[in-house]
Amino acid sequence: MRGAERSVKNTAKNVSLIVLVLLLLTLCAANWLIGLNVAQMPADSLLRRAHDQLFGGAVGYELRSSGVAAAEPVQLALTVDGQLYGVQYNVTDMDAAVAAVRDLWAQVLTGEELDPASEEELSAALRAGDCAELRYHGATPLGAVAGWMGGVWKDGSEIYVETLVYAAGSERLFVRTSDGALYAAAAKADKSVLESAQKAFRGLPCKFSGESYAVYPETLLFDSETLSLPLLKNEPIDLFSTRSGTGLEELLQVFGFTAYADFYAEQNDQVRVFIDNVSTLRVSATGLLQYASSAENTTVRAYEEGEVSGQSALDAQMDCARLILDAALRAGETNTHASLYAIGQEDRQTTLVFLQMYGGVPVLGESDFATFAFEDGALVSATVRLQRFDAQDMSRIVLPAKQAAAGAMGEPCGLMVAYREKEGESYVPARFYLKNAD
């Protein structure tokens, strides 16, 4: 009897040892795979497929959407105790406001159908009770906005929105597209969720413009508005300095290069051109980045061809571009951040355009801040223009929205606050009319 017990114990010990050895071998193999330069592996190689199965097929980011927003709202508003309150053009205020209303928008942005709506319908809904507004600059896919807020909007990759308004009184969602068109859908949020958002929301008193001015009815007019912003001046960037940000290593990595990639210098070493068998990365010390590759062999992919489609494919491409931008901004030690502004989709190609933001305010230049072109999920080109700004002691009060609305003429339009270059290298804040192209 005792001999049988000893035999069972010995067998259990042997099995445990075998399992431990197998686990150790697996961990060693996984660690070896992690250490490989997967970016340089052919996509159809056995090692690349093994790495992709264990750690995901994308280089530097996950295939599944991260849920991190690629676009930043510029205005948020919510009715609290019968009074509309809003926040605008401030990163700190905007982050707190988004946290307060996220659950509300998660419920509102769950649907699949939109129908054309009239300005009169929107104006009536704005007067019918509590409302919430979420506004971006540019064209943001409705499905992406829904995902960032925790909702799901079916086929939302096909409509690009600028402003979203939830009218609780009429239980409708209104969306304003980037070209000024207006759509609506039935929407409803739980009373408890709305009340929770109202308790957490903080902002300044404001109201909707309604039908009083030649601007969109949902335009926010703040009471006694004094939006004071500093003048900005360009500061020099040197990406090749040993003291510059995270250095070039991370920047090279997100573009699929190693720290030891071959390069040649131009313009007295003010430009370095990194090359491998399939792609080229041109880096200027002053902050201009230009990447080019062939779709068939690129090492930077948002997803493998045929893996995903629709909103999931768009989400993956936005994540890929956003993470590259994050690495570039760190390398340049800039004090700006990026926000998705426009999307172009044609056949198998997707183009993403990003705004540069300073403290939550867009900075507009002669050229786009960042542009990414994908083909079937493969990054084929990218251009990024890094800048660093110094806030001057002098500030300027931006023209209040109420005065700008009073001066609007013609067809209804939107309003935008942004920095524009003026007088050499100085950037001055101002409020602009957003007219739709005929």
Protein language model features and the residues they cover:
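Preferential activation on post-signal-peptide N-terminal prodomains/segments
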Residues: 2-5, 16, 20-22, 26-314, ...
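N-terminal membrane topogenic signal
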Residues: 10-15
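Short low-polarity hydrophobic stretches
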Residues: 24-29, 320-321, 370-372
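Short small/polar-residue motifs
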Residues: 160, 255-264, 275-280, 332-341, ...
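Beta-strand-connecting loop/turn residues
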Residues: 269, 286-287, 348, 376-378
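Segments that shape or occlude catalytic/ligand-binding pockets
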Residues: 300-308, 312-364, 383-438
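Transition segments tied to proteolytic processing and entry into folded domains
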Residues: 364-386
